[in-house]
UniProtKB/Swiss-Prot annotation:
PROSITE patterns cross-referenced by the UniProt entry: GLYCOPROTEASE (PS01016)
Keyword Phosphoprotein: no
Protein known as: tRNA N6-adenosine threonylcarbamoyltransferase
One term under GO cellular component: cytoplasm
Organism: Symbiobacterium thermophilum (strain DSM 24528 / JCM 14929 / IAM 14863 / T)
Gene: tsaD
GO biological process: tRNA threonylcarbamoyladenosine modification
GO MF annotations in UniProt: iron ion binding; N(6)-L-threonylcarbamoyladenine synthase activity
Length: 341
């Protein structure tokens, strides 16, 4: 079953509150994708507690890796390389996955490949059919990042714009808390917004100096002020506010992405990151792109949230390009999307 020419990559992900391992063949075929989520654990806290998350990763990392290998029907000896998230993320949780990956790479004499978590989200798009076609514009939108990227090919990236303050996903979480919704906030806001009027509450859209940059702090503040000014909200007011907020976010994301796609002359746009699972964003983006003859791609929701299949996919293309990392590879909590890789 091995197929040496395919390249079997074991991916490991532990950047936040998901302990994940996966085996991917040839950067495209998911043989297994095991995720142990801590969402239920942190729901009572309203967010991730780093120390608790790290301890839970320690308990889960080896069983999750074993399960991924068993589900894939492969042994450690058949793996060609070990790919692991080394940033960005929480330093304590990153170290758990990184330490496990180093131990495996050293013990098996296999290449170690450090993967940028954000690149992992991008490469989740290469695990679906049809795969994206270069050149393309990618919108990475998650709890910690909102980036607009031009990709001419594998490893050939240009950062076009990013958020100047809050990430879109962070704004979703904070607004969710302000209207009494649970954690994680994004899916809760999206669900509530379905029964609301997106035009009911006038909310600002930030204008940034950079044509492809984003800013959501003013929008978040406007929502908080509306809640304080209005007082206790009834169910319909909460739904209207959720819908109006969601529309304010998605309209800006769509407008900047379309502008970038037209400026770069691409025929392909892809979405990546947790917020890429948002149905309203997908629908509005598709409605804006299709009349322009631009294709829209995105992963299924299970590959939008943190997982190790995306890390293995990104790791495959790095492995194929000859990238190898030493065992002194560090966890980098604030790792950015490096231009060109």
């Amino acid at each position: 079953m091995k197929g040496l020419s395919e390249g079997l990559i074991l991916g490991i992900e532990s950047s936040c509150d998901e302990t994940a391992a996966a085996v991917v063949a040839g950067g495209r075929r998911v043989l297994s994708n095991t995720v142990a989520s801590q969402v239920d654990l942190f729901r009572k806290y309203g967010g991730v507690v780093p120390e608790i998350a790290s301890r839970r990763h320690l308990e889960l990392i080896l069983p999750v890796i074993r399960e991924a290998l068993q589900m894939a029907g492969v042994t450690l000896e058949q793996i060609d390389a070990v790919a692991v998230t080394h940033g960005p993320g929480l330093v304590g949780t990153l170290l758990v996955g990184l330490s496990a990956a180093k131990a495996l790479a050293f013990g098996l004499d296999k290449p170690l490949i450090g993967v940028n978590h954000l690149q992992g989200h991008i490469y989740a798009n290469f695990l679906v059919e049809p795969p994206p076609e270069f050149p393309l514009v990618c919108l990475v939108v998650s709890g910690g990042h909102t980036d607009l990227i031009y990709m001419a090919g594998h490893g050939r990236m240009e950062l076009l714009g990013r958020t100047l303050d809050d990430a879109a996903g962070e704004a979703f979480d904070k607004v969710a808390r302000s209207v009494g919704l649970g954690y994680p906030g994004g899916p809760q806001v999206e669900k509530l917004a379905r029964s609301g009027d997106p035009e009911a509450v006038p909310l600002p859209r930030a204008h940034t100096e950079g044509p492809y940059d984003f800013s959501f702090s003013g929008l978040k503040t406007a929502v908080l002020q509306y809640v304080q000014r209005t007082g206790p909200l009834n169910d319909q007011q909460r739904a209207d506010l959720a819908a109006s907020f969601q529309r304010a976010v998605t309209s800006v994301l769509v407008e900047r992405t379309v502008k970038a796609a037209e400026a770069k002359g691409v025929r392909q746009v892809i979405l990546a990151g947790g917020v890429a699972a948002n149905g309203a964003l997908r629908e509005e983006m598709r409605a804006a792109l299709e009349p322009r003859g631009i294709r829209l791609g995105y992963p299924p929701p299970v590959l939008c949230t943190d997982n190790a299949a995306m890390i293995a996919a990104a790791g495959y293309y790095l492995w194929r390009a000859g990238v190898r990392h030493d065992l002194d590879l560090n966890a980098v909590p604030g790792l950015g999307l490096g231009i060109g890789g």
